[in-house]
């Protein structure tokens, strides 16, 4: 479910007030999806405290109808380490938490993610696998030791096309029935300009292009569902390949040198 540019034009600019997001979540819940992962940070208190309670009520309503809720945990640079940006307790209570971090390679492209960062499962993993859980106490202990642990690097295989998308505005207006979401694993976020993170990635149709964080989470979830991922090279093998490339380049330059007879 995409809060796209059209949704922004019709409903209002970003960030949307939490009562509007609550109405959207209620609308999604009418379709009884199996799980709903929300790629939106709720780390700050709303200007109107009752708005946070409205959002909590919408999440509780969805959970009562059998939908698993996964909320985003962001990350910011600390003095000596990373600091997780948790949702407000009033919003996070009772819900699964997942990290939303992607890392760029040396060439500036995103090709995968860590399945676990800071004792938090990747949001896409938590969406696909109900056994993926966060451990806030372990995260706190890690931060006290000034560490940010990452585990299980996963390289994603490119998809021919992205998973299907529904415009948030169309869902709110009633142009699209929430029944389309029945039993599905749903991601809610935004691809609108100025609303979130954007990356360059070859994960759609194997061609590097600008892609939103929401779309990357969708690719990661789909790749896990269909087991379409690659095994990353081990550090020693990666280093050996880089050395070999350097040696071959030096050999080529030597053989083509004009100073050789």
What kind of region is each of these model predictions?
Residues 133-176:
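Substrate-access "cap/lid" subdomains that shape
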Residues 2-145, 181-261:
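Non-transmembrane functional regions of envelope-associated proteins
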């Amino acid at each position: 479910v995409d809060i796209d540019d059209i949704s922004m034009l019709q409903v209002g600019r970003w960030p949307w007030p939490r009562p509007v997001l609550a109405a959207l979540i209620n609308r999604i819940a009418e379709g009884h999806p199996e799980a709903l992962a929300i790629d939106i940070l709720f780390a700050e208190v709303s200007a109107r405290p009752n708005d946070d309670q409205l959002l909590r009520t919408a999440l509780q309503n969805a959970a009562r109808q059998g939908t698993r809720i996964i909320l985003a945990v962001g990350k910011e640079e600390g003095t000596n380490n990373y600091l997780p940006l948790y949702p407000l307790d009033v919003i996070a209570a009772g819900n699964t938490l997942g990290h939303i971090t992607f890392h760029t390679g040396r060439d500036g492209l995103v090709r995968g993610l860590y399945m676990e960062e800071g004792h938090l499962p990747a949001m896409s993993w938590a969406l696909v696998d109900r056994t993926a859980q966060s451990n806030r106490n372990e995260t706190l202990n890690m931060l006290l030791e000034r560490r940010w642990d990452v585990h299980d690097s996963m390289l994603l295989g490119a998809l021919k096309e992205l998973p299907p998308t529904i415009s948030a505005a169309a869902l709110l207006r009633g142009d699209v029935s929430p029944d389309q979401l029945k039993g599905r694993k749903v991601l809610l976020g935004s691809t609108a300009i100025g609303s979130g993170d954007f990356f360059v990635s070859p994960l759609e149709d194997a061609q590097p292009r600008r892609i939103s964080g929401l779309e990357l989470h969708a690719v990661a979830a789909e790749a896990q569902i269909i087991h379409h991922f690659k095994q990353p090279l081990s550090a020693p093998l990666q280093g050996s390949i880089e050395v070999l490339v350097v040696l071959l380049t030096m050999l080529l330059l030597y053989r083509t040198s004009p100073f050789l007879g």
